[in-house]
Amino acid sequence: MDPNGHAAIVTGAASGLGAETAAVLVRAGAKVALLDVNIDGARQQADKIGGLALRCDVTSSDDAVAALKAARERHGPARILVNCAGVGPAKRMVGRDGPMPLAEFEKVIAINLIGTFNMMRLAAADMQSLEPLTDHERGVIVSTASVAAFEGQIGQTAYAASKGGVAALTIPAARELSQFGIRVMAIAPGIFGTPMLRALPQAAQDSLGASVPFPKRLGEPREFADLVLTIVRSNYLNGEVIRLDGALRMAPR
């Protein structure tokens, strides 16, 4: 699908991978709605690139319905959804203070996995009634997994479980939505230079980058966004989780 002229939704778009993805899609001609709970950050990014900022808690059905409705009224129904909203707290299952509070595990699952499914189901419901394009395609959904889905480290039980769920969701969703001409893909990024990592001391950033086989550096958000654009444009990419990690395989800690 050529994104030029089509409406797109990007969640978690106030910063990091989501912000850069929104910018790349706008440059490709898409009409982009930037969704985030951080509405001030989303507005700042939207003003910079020429998009529409909308507040949305992806774990809330009401929020998601309202945000998609507002985006649809401004840009028309979206043919592109990119799920970037997520959290990645590190906490051991059993620590010095005892077992991880169940609420903390549930929060990570709610945002990363349930939030992804919530946006996917609602966007797909809109896409299914659109006029088909080349190859009878009506839409494309790209979600964000993680290499932690495959090699979760100590302290990543909640995060790895949530991202493993996103990875596992991809193929059944692609199979189910194929009847409507909707593709479903996921990207599993490695260690990326998001604002959270860039806030670490330079020595820590260098150490993380050196752990990547090649190139020996942190991934750049633009590289993630460029892969999203490639997926959008490549109709035969469907039902796959693409690792974007410089051949990194995570150690236990």
Regions found by a protein language model. Give the residues of each.
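Catalytic Tyr-X3-Lys loop
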Residues: 87, 98-118, 142, 166
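Alpha-helical segment proximal to the catalytic Tyr-Lys
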Residues: 125, 174-176
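Active-site helix of classical SDR
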Residues: 120, 162, 170
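Residue(s) in the substrate-gating loop at a strand-loop-helix junction
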Residues: 146
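Conserved mid-core segment of classical short-chain dehydrogenase/reductases
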Residues: 88-106, 125, 129-135, 155-158, ...
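Canonical Rossmann dinucleotide-binding motif of NAD(H)/NADP(H)-dependent dehydrogenases/reductases
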Residues: 2-32
